[in-house]
Amino acid sequence: FDFTYSGIPGDPLKLLEYNADTPTGIIEAAICQKTWYQQQRLDAQGYGHWGEIGEAFTERWRQIFAAETTPQLHLAHVNESIDPYQEDYNNVWLIAHAAQLTKLIPIDEIIFNEDTKSWSDADGKPINNLFKLYPWEDLVTDSESGYDKLLFAYHGSIRRWVEPAWKMFLSNKL
């Protein structure tokens, strides 16, 4: 969730958006949790690891793809021209450590093969499982970049969307 607050006592929080489609909060929380633990030097004080969000996150990704016949997970992110601080890249980079067989790709390097009616990466490797850190509402409205084709042109050739299209109804700002 993204909120704003006026700072005036008694004023309510205002909800700006619900980030159901691009859930980076768990990644950010795991990093903050681990960083805080290290900075406080809790291990030197005899405390075991405090909080296990990151470990649980990693283990769940491994469970999800353990039984996959095509376990490659493509992690799509926007390029530097859209995200100059590379926040999205860094988030998918962290997910890459959780899943076992991953490939990070800029979303503009997802290619539609007219002959096979399927999606692939720039190396020609088929995309069967895709996590994209790019809002669905932008995909469906961005005909200039061609990203909208991911949804409308042979959407079914990608077997597993980690964050499926129905999530756009929860997070849509249009």
Predicted regions mapped to residue ranges:
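Short hydrophobic beta-strand that contains or immediately precedes a catalytic carboxylate
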Residues: 14-19
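Domain-scale recognition of functional cores that engage charged ligands
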Residues: 4-9, 24-174
